[in-house]
Curated annotation (Swiss-Prot):
One of its GO terms (biological process) is regulation of DNA-templated transcription. It comes from the Bacteria. Residues 55-74 bind DNA. SUPFAM superfamilies: Homeodomain-like. This is Putative Fis-like DNA-binding protein. Pfam families: HTH_8. Transmembrane segments: none annotated. Keywords: DNA-binding. GO terms for molecular function: sequence-specific DNA binding. Gene3D superfamilies: Homeodomain-like. It comes from Neisseria meningitidis serogroup B (strain ATCC BAA-335 / MC58). The lineage of its organism: Bacteria, Pseudomonadati, Pseudomonadota, Betaproteobacteria, Neisseriales.
Length: 79
């Protein structure tokens, strides 16, 4: 049987469920931004590696404007 990667959305869901359990009843705040920030950085790292650091290629792969990509790379400390 071939090895299959878990669905990304399922991985996120499982981690969020664990996050809420770990809060132990404490009311969360800013979950949306937290999740986007946590997902965006590894996405950027992986795509930049796949593109050999070429921001123009990475922006096309991501469907982002090159300046938007550059801004995000700076925000995540990747430049």
């Amino acid at each position: 049987m071939p090895h299959t990667l878990p669905d990304i959305s399922q991985c996120i869901r499982q981690n969020l469920e664990q996050y809420f359990k770990d809060l132990n009843g404490t009311e969360p705040c800013g979950v949306y931004d937290m999740v986007l920030h946590q997902v965006e950085k590894p996405l950027l790292v992986c795509v930049m590696e796949q593109c050999g650091g070429n921001q123009s290629k990475a922006s096309v792969m991501l469907g982002l404007n090159r300046n938007t990509l550059r801004k995000k790379l700076i925000q995540h400390g990747l430049l």
